[in-house]
């Protein structure tokens, strides 16, 4: 299906569903933070910090494991995909990319501020365009470039404190920051791969195999980390987190909404939009995260919050108001 041949009502519907995805992913920042904070309260700060990597890998394992189980149970027709080689190939590619992105993001979150994390993660908007140019010879127009830059810049300054400047985002780069940049690159690749794969195979079926692959990779990572770190003695403590409401509730929210529902909608509706336009829509994620954080008292309103929201929304508007002939040219040259 070519993007320029999609009916306006289908494109509009797809845009709304991808907007819903950004709202859900905005909440996941809060849910992940709540789960990590819960581990400190349950296990104690010292132990939680000592086995931080194990807890992170366990969280990713359970998040996608739960999502995979629920998906297979409630979408029986997709089980047919488990017998198809092309579905597994697509799921392997998407699953590996999704696992890499979420795993590196979670590794960095405990040691990075929400503002910097949101900004660096939003770089997948830029990476999507760059990967599209290098792999698919996709033309990026100057209007699209301006939109991407504005959206990325806006996402970056949303969480700055009142007395901070833009430079504060760049002067303290360490391992967590670079892990998040790697996460952003992988998410950009995932968007491109999703666009290509869901054009060829059933979106629901490939979502099922993708979730299974992410679960398996997460299990392998969890076991390797806990063995290498020689922390097998803490396995009982880690598993005991599953009976703690303050840990399991946000975990389930991430699994059912952040992983199952969001990725399902992404795989079904993203194919009706261009990859770069989809990435721009996803740039709204930090806006929702900021709004929700303010609502529940986790964030203070600053001049940077409003300036960032304005720049991000303006960037999206510039992209959406491009001349329709530019859309046609982009898709023709990507074939």
Which residues make up each language-model segment?
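Glycine-/small-residue-enriched transmembrane alpha-helix faces in small-molecule transporters
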Residues: 1-58, 104, 168-196, 334-335
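C-terminal-most transmembrane helix of multi-pass membrane proteins
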Residues: 2-8, 60, 64-65, 143, ...
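Membrane-interface helix-cap regions at the ends of transmembrane helices
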Residues: 4-5, 34, 38, 65-83, ...
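Loop-to-transmembrane-helix transition segments
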Residues: 13-22, 72-104, 174-183, 233-261, ...
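Transmembrane alpha-helical segments that form core, pore/gating elements
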Residues: 22, 30-31, 68-71, 128-129, ...
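Transmembrane alpha-helices of multi-pass small-molecule transport proteins
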Residues: 38-100, 127, 186-193, 208-228, ...
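C-terminal transmembrane-helix exit sites in multi-pass transporters
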Residues: 48, 105, 124-149, 287-307
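Helix-helix packing/entry segments at the starts of transmembrane helices
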Residues: 99-103, 117-123, 194-216, 255-295
């Amino acid at each position: 299906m070519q993007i320029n041949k999609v009916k306006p009502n289908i494109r509009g519907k797809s845009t709304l569903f991808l907007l819903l995805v950004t709202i859900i992913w905005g909440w996941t920042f809060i849910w992940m933070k709540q789960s990590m904070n819960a581990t400190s309260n349950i296990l104690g700060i010292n132990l939680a910090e000592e086995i931080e990597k194990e807890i992170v890998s366990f969280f990713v394992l359970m998040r996608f494991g739960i999502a995979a189980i629920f998906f297979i149970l409630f979408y029986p027709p997709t089980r047919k995909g488990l017998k198809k080689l092309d579905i597994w190939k697509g799921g392997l590619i998407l699953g590996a990319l999704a696992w890499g992105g979420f795993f590196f993001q979670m590794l960095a979150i405990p040691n990075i501020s929400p503002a910097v994390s949101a900004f660096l993660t939003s770089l997948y908007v830029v990476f999507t365009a760059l990967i599209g140019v290098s792999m698919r010879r996709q033309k990026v127009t100057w209007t699209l470039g301006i939109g991407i830059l504005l959206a990325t810049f806006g996402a970056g300054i949303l969480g700055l404190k009142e007395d901070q400047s833009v430079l504060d985002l760049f002067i303290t780069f360490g391992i967590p920051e670079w892990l998040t940049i790697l996460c952003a690159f992988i998410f950009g690749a995932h968007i491109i791969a999703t666009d290509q794969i869901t054009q060829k195979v059933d979106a629901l079926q490939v979502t099922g195999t993708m979730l299974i692959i992410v679960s398996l990779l997460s299990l392998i990572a969890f076991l390797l980390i806990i063995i290498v770190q020689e922390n097998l003695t803490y396995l009982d403590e880690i598993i005991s987190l599953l009976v703690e409401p303050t840990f399991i509730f946000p975990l389930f929210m991430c699994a059912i909404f952040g992983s199952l529902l969001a990725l399902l909608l992404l795989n079904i509706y993203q194919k009706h939009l261009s990859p770069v336009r989809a990435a721009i829509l996803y740039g709204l994620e930090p806006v929702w995260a900021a709004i929700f954080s303010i609502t529940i008292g986790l964030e203070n309103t600053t001049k940077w919050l409003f300036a960032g929201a304005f720049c991000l929304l303006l960037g999206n508007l510039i992209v959406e108001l491009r001349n329709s002939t530019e859309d046609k040219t982009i898709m023709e040259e990507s074939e």
